Design a protein with these regions (language model features):
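Bacterial N-terminal signal peptides that target proteins for export
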Residues: 1-12
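Hydrophobic small-molecule pocket/channel-lining residues, especially in calycin-type beta-barrels
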Residues: 2-3, 25-161
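Bacterial N-terminal signal peptides
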Residues: 11-20
């Protein structure tokens, strides 16, 4: 059985990547695009478990971003998510996540993007992504509730590949 917490983390991680795009678009058409890897050692999960690995690919898509993730959950099962969104706050479908049906993105400033995850219309998490000024890393603060109704507070650290 796949760990719901691990799947949730993977879905949230997808936001992190999309958020990178929001600040990237604000700075330049090419900043923030490409491949990113979760730094599991520097990231913090409450509750866990942390995924064993997670990679995100960011690609421009019209006025927004296409985000795809591939990873290995803490229990060893594989997971992948995908969505394409503009930075207009409108809900769009997320594929592959058991904990998130839709996401929406809003760009706060050149380096900060907020993603809202929903399941059956209910907000499950808010993810705030901040891109480092050097463009080599970003963090994502995740605050919400997991499928069990438990509070979630994660800090994800990503490195550009």
């Amino acid at each position: 059985m796949k760990s719901i917490a691990s799947k949730w983390v993977l879905g949230l991680a997808a936001f992190a990547f999309a958020a990178s795009m929001s600040s990237a678009l604000a700075q330049s058409e090419n900043t923030g695009m490409g491949n990113w890897k979760l730094n599991v050692e520097k990231s913090k999960y409450s509750p866990g478990p942390a995924p064993k690995s997670l990679n995100i690919k960011f690609e421009p898509a019209g006025k927004g971003v296409k985000v795809t993730t591939e990873g290995v959950n803490g229990d060893g099962s594989k997971n992948a998510t995908e969505y394409t969104a503009n930075y207009d706050g409108k809900d769009v479908p997320m594929k592959g996540s058991p904990t998130t049906d839709t996401v929406s993105l809003v760009r706060k400033d050149a380096n900060t993007t907020v993603r809202t995850d929903k399941k059956a219309g209910k907000v499950m998490a808010t993810l705030t992504r901040v891109v480092a000024k050097d463009g080599k890393s970003f963090t994502v603060a995740v605050v919400g509730t997991n499928a069990k109704g438990e509070p979630v507070n994660h800090m994800l650290v990503w490195d550009k590949q």
